[in-house]
Structures are given as structure tokens and as C-alpha cells.
Amino acid sequence: WGQLTTRDSVRTVQLWGLSPAFYLPVADLADRYEPFAAATVSYQRKNKKNSFYGLDFDAFYGTSVKNTDAIFGGLTDENGNYIGVNGEFAIMNAGLSGAQITVNTGRIFKTNYNPNSGWMVLQGFGLQQTKISVRNERGNFPQLAPPMIYGYDRLHRGVASKTSLRYLRLDNDERINFMVGFTVNTAVTRSVRGFNVDTGLEDAALKLDLSVGLNFTWLLPVYAKQESFF
């Protein structure tokens, strides 16, 4: 009997990952937001055929929204200031807040470094949500507190596709394990509110919300026990 090693044998492994990412919005998403960041928690299981299946949860975070003057201009004075309770200035910061969850499958199509590492593709399908999140640093502007914010937050939900080209490196000594890659998120969404207070118009159209980005994933591998060969 002999023990399988990552260096010379294809192994079954569970991969737990934590990933920062940077995305550029495209299509309808670019009409609402500037570039944004994401943090991903992932689980993938690789079998002895170098095929994968798993789950990703992405949390989106951005610090800049397009057209804020148009969206919130009706709530400011002639100088563009937000006047809070008791006549104090309110400090308002608007950004993107969102999430995406996908079920993924994929495979290594070109091995490199060892039989468990190399270039791979992952394809996932799931759900996506994005909205404008407004932070009131002094808590003194009730006009943009719930439920009033709902008329301005551009909350959208819909079905999503996540396509990734990645390089996977599983260390021969099981110490340093990571993925780097390029990802395209494609979502077809619709406004949950159905109406925008600032425009006074119905918002019922489907949106094509795309984003493209780069990510780095730090992996914790958990190998199947007692893998051996004759």
C-alpha cells in the first residue's frame, strides 16, 4: 500500500476559500454605480477527475453612486447641503451594497505544477441583489431613514450567472494554497420597489447588470482521509 500525495496523484479535496475582489460595473449596473469591491466566502469540492462543485457567497461594497445630485437633490438646500433635525448639517455617504449567491461547477482543463493544480473554469448560477446604501454619520436626517429610503435605494434583485477563469495552486506540502482569476457576473434584475420617488416615475424595466473583475482566493484544503493506492 502507498499514500496518495498532492505532488503526484489527483486527490479528492474540499476547498474553503476567502477572497477579496475588485469589479468594474458594465451595462445597466454602470449607470448606477462606480467600481466596487467584494468579499467572497466559498466552498468547492474537487474529485479525482479534477471536477468541481460548490457554493459562493459574494458581498458587494462600493463607496460611490452615480447621479447622487439628481437622486437626492430634492432633499438638499440650494447649496447642496443636507439639513438635519435642529438645523444641523447632515453628513450623508451613499454607496453600493449588495450580495450574490451561486451554485458552481467546473473543472481543471490544463494541469500545471502538480496533478491537482492548473487552469480551470467555474460556472455558477444563482441570485443577485444590489441597492444604494446611505450612511448618515450623525443620525440626524430621518428623510433617508427606513422606510423613507425605500423610495430612493434602487433595490434590484434577479437571477445571476458567475463565470470564472482561474489558476488554482494546491501546494505539494499542503501549506500555501490559492486561486487567482478573472470573473464575469451577469444578472438580469428588476426593481423591487417599482417606483423612484426622485423621478416620480415607475421603474419596471428589466436591467442587464454586468460586472467584470479580478479576485484572489486564499484556500484551506481538507483532503479525504485514508486515500491510498496499491
What are these regions, as identified by a protein language model?
Residues 27-32, 64-98, 130-158, 189-197, ...:
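Extracellular/periplasm-exposed beta-strand and loop segments of Gram-negative cell-envelope proteins
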